[in-house]
Each structure stands twice: as structure tokens, then as C-alpha cells.
């Protein structure tokens, strides 16, 4: 009996190196360490009642400190060491009778660990089905107030392209975003190009759109001229053709003024005769005094 035991011990030592080559250490994060109960269960004394099955020797007790505590070797009656892996049993849903801890390892290996990196959430625009076809939902159009439209129109007449500081300043003054101002200018430029391509006059060049106080009525004459003056010049050109007398008498000044308002020839002749009569009377009165 002692010789048989020594022969088996020698075979165990020889098979340790083989088990290290074929069975690397497997650490199970969910199972506890081997206890004295496990060693007692797999001790040669516990297996003595079933000699036809052989016995299992723990490799972590005396000989196999380098091996894992959960690895065991099965030795048959002929002393040859046979390595049994619990994976063959775990694939069928039950554990090995000699390796009960492998019933957990098979299920643990089949469970995929959760991914450590969170998936990036890609925000896609809402899509709805229209007549069986997917269609993206457009954003609502921006409604501009009359004050905002007037300010944008005035700025567009000055320049059709805005720099970044100008666009930011205009958007802040009107309470809009820079994107809204940029889109408004883009739409306005495309509209102007389309109108000019069709050969139509842009509304910006009309006086009513550029200046709200402008009037399209014809201009009134600047200088008001009496109708009698034009008539007197056309019918009586001889009034201005004759040289005026050099004397600044009241009669001569009266004749000049009356020529415009009284164009009739009879009245003009009477005035001239009256002036000629007053001139010799003035000379005679001077001699008397």
C-alpha cells in the first residue's frame, strides 16, 4: 500500500508541470477562495468510498502553490493523470462533478461585459412621414417686426454685406440673433439678383420705398409770374424798345409801372401827353418865383 501511494505521489509531482502548461491560472471574480471544506471534500479520504472513480487531490495544499486553488486533477486507477476542464460541462448547462466551480465560469464567460464607453447620442432632426416618404420638419420662420424690417432695410441700402462686428452690433440693437440677420441679408441679396435678372426695377430704387416722405407729383413752378406781364410783352414790344427818359420824375416812374398793368395804347398815350404838359408848367413856376 505504501509503494502504491509513493508511486502516485511521484506521478502527481510529474503531472504538476504538465498541468501548469495546459491549465493556466483562472481567477474567478465572483467565487470565494478555497476553504477547508473544499479540501476535505476533495481529499483522498473522502474519495476512498468510491475507488472506481479515483480521487481528486487539491494542488494548493502541499504541492501546487503556483497553481490556482480551484484547479484539481483527476487520477484514475492506473495512476495516469488526466486533466478535466469544466468548460466541457458548462457548455451543456451543468457543472463538472470534479470541478463544481466551473458551473459558474461557463455562464460568466458567455455574459458580455457592459461597454465602458457610453454611446454618443446623435441629435437628429425630427422626421415625419408624408405620403409614405420621410420628410424633415422645418423650423418655423422668423417673424420680424416693422421696426426691425425698417432698420434692416436702411442698413441694406448702405451696404449689402456686413462684417462680423457690424452684424453683431446690428443684431444686438434689434434684439435678433446673428444667424437671423445673416439669413435676412442672404435672402435679400438673392431677391435683388433675381429681380435684376428678370429686368425689373428693384423696389429699393423707387423714391417711395427709399424715402417715405417723397412725393411722385410733378413739381410746381418756383417763380410766380402774372399773366398780364407775358401778354403785355407779346402784344406791345415797343414799350421796352424805346429808351427811357433820363429824368427821374414821378411821371416817368409812373409810366414804367403802368406799362405792365395797363397795356392799352390809348391810356398810355394820354399819360404821355399829361407828362409833357406838367414839364413846361414846372419851368414857368420856377421863373415866377
UniProtKB/Swiss-Prot annotation:
Residues 16-44, 198-254 are annotated as: Disordered. Residues 26-40, 206-220 have a biased composition (Polar residues). Expression restricted to anterior ectodermal derivatives, namely the ventral forebrain, the cranial neural crest and the cement gland. Also expressed in the olfactory and otic placodes. GO terms for cellular component: nucleus. GO terms for biological process: anatomical structure formation involved in morphogenesis; cell differentiation; embryonic skeletal system development; regulation of transcription by RNA polymerase II. Residues 242-253 have a biased composition (Low complexity). PANTHER family: HOMEOBOX PROTEIN, HOMEOBOX PROTEIN DLX-5. This is Homeobox protein DLL-3. It comes from Xenopus laevis (African clawed frog). The lineage of its organism: Eukaryota, Metazoa, Chordata, Craniata, Vertebrata. The gene is dll3.
Amino acid at each position: 500500500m505504501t509503494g502504491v501511494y509513493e508511486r502516485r505521489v511521484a506521478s502527481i509531482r510529474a503531472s504538476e508541470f504538465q498541468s501548469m502548461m495546459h491549465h493556466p491560472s483562472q481567477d474567478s471574480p465572483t467565487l470565494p477562495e478555497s476553504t477547508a471544506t473544499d479540501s476535505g471534500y476533495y481529499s483522498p479520504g473522502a474519495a476512498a468510498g468510491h475507488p472506481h472513480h479515483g480521487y481528486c487531490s487539491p494542488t494548493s495544499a502541499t504541492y501546487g502553490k503556483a497553481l490556482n486553488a480551484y484547479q484539481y486533477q483527476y487520477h484514475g486507477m492506473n495512476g495516469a493523470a488526466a486533466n478535466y476542464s469544466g468548460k466541457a460541462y458548462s457548455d451543456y448547462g451543468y457543472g463538472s462533478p470534479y470541478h463544481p466551480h466551473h458551473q459558474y465560469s461557463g455562464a460568466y464567460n458567455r455574459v458580455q461585459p457592459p461597454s465602458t464607453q457610453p454611446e454618443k447620442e446623435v441629435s437628429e432632426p425630427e422626421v415625419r412621414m408624408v405620403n409614405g416618404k420621410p420628410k424633415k420638419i422645418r423650423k418655423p420662420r422668423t417673424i420680424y417686426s416693422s421696426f426691425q424690417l425698417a432698420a434692416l432695410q436702411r442698413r441694406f441700402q448702405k451696404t449689402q454685406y456686413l462684417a462680423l462686428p457690424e452684424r453683431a452690433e446690428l443684431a444686438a440693437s434689434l434684439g435678433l440673433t446673428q444667424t437671423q440677420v445673416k439669413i435676412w441679408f442672404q435672402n435679400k441679396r438673392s431677391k435683388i439678383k433675381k429681380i435684376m435678372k428678370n429686368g425689373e426695377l428693384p423696389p429699393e430704387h423707387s423714391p417711395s420705398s427709399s424715402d417715405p416722405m417723397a412725393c411722385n407729383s410733378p413739381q410746381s413752378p418756383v417763380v410766380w409770374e402774372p399773366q398780364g406781364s407775358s401778354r403785355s410783352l407779346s402784344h406791345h414790344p415797343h414799350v421796352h424798345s424805346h429808351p427811357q427818359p433820363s429824368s427821374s420824375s414821378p411821371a416817368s416812374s409812373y409810366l414804367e409801372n403802368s406799362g405792365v398793368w395797363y397795356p392799352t395804347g390809348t391810356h398810355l398815350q394820354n399819360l404821355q401827353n399829361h407828362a409833357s404838359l406838367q414839364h413846361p408848367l414846372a419851368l414857368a413856376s420856377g421863373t415866377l418865383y
